[in-house]
């Protein structure tokens, strides 16, 4: 067990509130030996997260609690286990102008506090890389450079007044960038994830969401998102519904949206309580990325990506009361990983 207490020091008047928040945002992750990567096309490892009505991750299920109804894919659920493989996470940080928020707000400080907190998650079973993007990937810190290099670059960005980048419009192309992000994962597997920190507003990507989902389907890479709200209360704010649905179809989850007025990020009497609430929520979110379970399923020979129809049995649903289940909604052929540029 690793116990970590982190203190992130953003720039601005909220420094003391941020310090308080990230002192309580400690996350303990199990140190677990690595498992072999996916290598058998007949037996596929489907990453699954089940939560109860309060959003807490459920780990007490067995393979008998799941029902897989797919004639095209197969119907055999072989086992349900903790995912002991090494988890690689590519953090995709949106640095486009909209991440600045409303005039006078401190949204960018919130963004940097969140991404620095993510980068500080400690586990012997995880690796992190970073990509900064607007309408394209601007720069990267890859896995080989290590966690220290990643955290150092984030610290530099937090102090650099040229961030976020102010563009000329149509400067946030999330789906184009996600396609590039997959290429940072050499020999990807279903233990790998993309974590996007963004406002969720795509502007003119040439790549369609379903094209990205098709690219993810072979290795079953999941996409997670930390959403921030740059225009809280504004009627003209764009709809993020399409992006949220995309994340969920990939098998991932969404945290937020968080805005600059969130009590956890303000220097007020309510900061401590709000920080504790956010600590618990972030802890569950991270565990969905790094401590998921896997269903080993027997897969028939498939020639193209197929929908996955997975559900809990009636008895399991009754026992858990309003559970939610997160898993990749599409499974591709072994040859559909498409790591070529």
Q: Predicted segments — roles?
A:
Residues 1-17:
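N-terminal secretory signal peptides that target proteins for export/translocation
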Residues 19-30:
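Bacterial N-terminal signal peptides
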Residues 38-90, 95-104:
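Acidic, polar low-complexity linker/tail segments
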Residues 39-44, 260-341:
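C-terminal "exit" segments of structured domains
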Residues 66, 94, 130-133, 181, ...:
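DG-centered beta-turn motif at the end of beta-strands
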Residues 84-191, 193-197, 203, 227-239:
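Von Willebrand factor
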Residues 200-249:
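VWA/integrin I-like adhesion module and closely mimicked acidic/polar interface patches used
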């Amino acid at each position: 067990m690793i116990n970590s207490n982190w203190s992130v020091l953003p720039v601005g008047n909220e420094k003391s509130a941020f310090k308080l928040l990230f002192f309580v945002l400690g996350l303990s992750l199990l140190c677990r030996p690595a498992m072999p990567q996916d290598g058998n096309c007949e037996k596929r490892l489907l990453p699954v997260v089940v939560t109860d009505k309060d959003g807490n991750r459920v780990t007490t299920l067995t393979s008998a609690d799941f029902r897989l109804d797919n004639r095209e894919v197969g119907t055999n659920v072989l086992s349900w286990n903790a995912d002991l493989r090494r988890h690689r996470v590519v953090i995709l940080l949106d640095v486009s102008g909209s991440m600045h928020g409303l005039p006078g707000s401190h949204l960018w400080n919130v963004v940097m506090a969140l991404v620095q907190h993510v980068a500080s998650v400690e586990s012997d079973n995880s690796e992190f890389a970073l990509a900064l993007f607007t309408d394209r990937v601007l720069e990267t810190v890859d896995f080989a450079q290590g966690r220290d290099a990643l955290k150092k670059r984030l610290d530099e960005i937090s102090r650099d007044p040229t961030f976020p980048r102010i563009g000329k419009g149509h400067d946030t192309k999330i789906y184009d960038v996600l396609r590039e992000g997959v290429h940072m994962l050499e020999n990807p597997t279903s233990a790998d994830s993309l974590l996007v920190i963004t406002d969720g507003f795509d502007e003119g990507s040439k790549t369609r969401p379903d094209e990205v989902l098709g690219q993810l389907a072979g290795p079953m890479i999941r996409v997670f998102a930390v959403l921030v709200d740059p225009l809280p209360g504004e009627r003209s704010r764009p709809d993020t519904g399409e992006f949220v649905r995309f994340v969920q179809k990939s098998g991932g989850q969404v945290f937020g949206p968080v805005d600059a007025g969130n009590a956890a990020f303000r220097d007020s009497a309510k900061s401590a309580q709000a920080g504790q609430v956010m600590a618990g929520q972030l802890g569950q979110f991270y565990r969905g990325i790094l401590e998921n379970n896997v269903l080993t399923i027997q897969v028939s020979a498939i020639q193209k990506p197929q929908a996955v129809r997975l559900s809990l049995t009636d008895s399991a649903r009754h026992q858990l009361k309003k559970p939610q289940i997160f898993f990749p909604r599409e499974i591709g052929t072994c040859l559909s990983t498409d790591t070529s540029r």
